[in-house]
């Protein structure tokens, strides 16, 4: 996390210095991880033609920051070399403490282990000097307005203030609004709303939920408590027909009457009676 913060602060300051009108919204964790991986492969020796492809790096940065390709290659190389030295110093600082504890736990068998604390002391002094240079670097390249943000938000770090101010393109009011709303910038930012005064804090979760429901949602509580029981459809009364063609249908008042059409004699002759003939026996 510390290495990513160093990379993000250095890139933001570099782009803001050479491209003041550039859109920094494309700089995210993906490009920071890419730069960190590229610089990790370089090592403390810095960039060279064998281990660093300037064209590929410039093309990648151009995709995230339009106009990055117009920056001179020498300026980009100096920034890469300086940032590589800062990262190597930070890595040495992280590795010194585990190595020193491991050396103290070992038993001195030969004269070689006895000389290791002196080497560690020299590495510690060199890493401390690199760390001081690293700390002095961002302070020299602070964006205008960072001191105001740090004064208003004491819990905000320098990297966070630079990130928010770069996102706001130097607009101090917009940067303050972003800090109040708690918009996260660098990966390790836990949010600035922890120790802010009540008037500068953003709305809490429950308050925000109730506000949204009150403003945008219409809830009819009386209507929700009602139980809707639809009425059963009423049956239509039977329509009784008593007369058809001026004749009484029946005394019961049925609706329909079986009306048979008269058939011709030729049609009747075609009918076949399938029932067997009835046998009559006379005694």
From Swiss-Prot:
Q: Which residues form the CUE domain?
A: 141-184
Keyword set for this entry?
Answer: Cytoplasm, Nucleus, Phosphoprotein, Ubl conjugation pathway
Q: Which residues carry this modification: Phosphoserine?
A: 110
Which Pfam family, giving just one, matches this sequence?
A: CUE
Enumerate the GO terms in the molecular function aspect: ubiquitin binding
Give the location in the cell.
Answer: Cytoplasm; Nucleus
Basic and acidic residues: compositionally biased ranges = 115-124
Bias (Polar residues) occurs at: 87-109
**Out of the domains of life, which is the source?**
Eukaryota
Region annotated Disordered, chain positions: 87-139
GO BP annotations of the record are:
negative regulation of cytokine production involved in inflammatory response; negative regulation of macrophage cytokine production
Q: Which InterPro entries match?
A: CUE, CUE_CUED2
Q: Cellular component GO terms, alphabetically?
A: cytosol; nuclear membrane; nucleoplasm
The free-text domain note is: The CUE domain mediates interaction with PGR and ESR1.
Q: Which family does it belong to?
A: Belongs to the CUEDC2 family.
User: Which PANTHER family does this one have?
Assistant: CUE DOMAIN CONTAINING 2 (PTHR12493), CUE DOMAIN-CONTAINING PROTEIN 2 (PTHR12493:SF0)
Q: What does this protein do?
A: Controls PGR and ESR1 protein levels through their targeting for ubiquitination and subsequent proteasomal degradation.
**Subunit comment:** Interacts with PGR and ESR1.
Q: What is this protein called?
A: CUE domain-containing protein 2
What organism does the UniProt record list as the source?
Bos taurus (Bovine)
